[in-house]
Amino acid sequence: MRSVTSMRLEGCAAVSTGRIRFYVATAMHGRVSTLGRVVYVAPHLSATFAVHEAHNKLGWCVSDTESGGRAGFSLTSEDGAIADAIAELSKRTDADMRRARKRLRQLVAKA
């Protein structure tokens, strides 16, 4: 796995979605450095960083663990705006989180 993490990994698995295969590592509650970006993960969020097997491209998934870890966004774009929006999720209040999630959905729709 090529994504670089500076935190404890919760698990690692190979995940297939159609013809696309990812190696996935999940990190909880801390700091992740990957592809030159540092993302802070708040206690109520988990973040998954995936590397595309064939093209070595980064994919993202951020889940809200307060809602059972099922609500989240699966992102396979390298768009910097998406990475920025994910990083912002960890610094927001509950009201701001709703706006940030809406913004993430808009960015994903455009990607």
List PLM regions with ranges.
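Short, solvent-exposed coil/turn segments at beta-strand boundaries
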Residues: 43-48, 65-68
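Short beta-strand micro-motifs enriched in acidic
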Residues: 52-56
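Conserved, surface-exposed functional patches that form binding/active-site neighborhoods
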Residues: 58-61, 65
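A short, exposed loop/beta-hairpin motif centered on an aromatic-Gly-Thr core
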Residues: 65-79
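Stable alpha-helical structural segments in soluble proteins, enriched in small hydrophobic residues
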Residues: 81-85
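Anionic, Ser/Thr-rich low-complexity intrinsically disordered regions
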Residues: 86-108
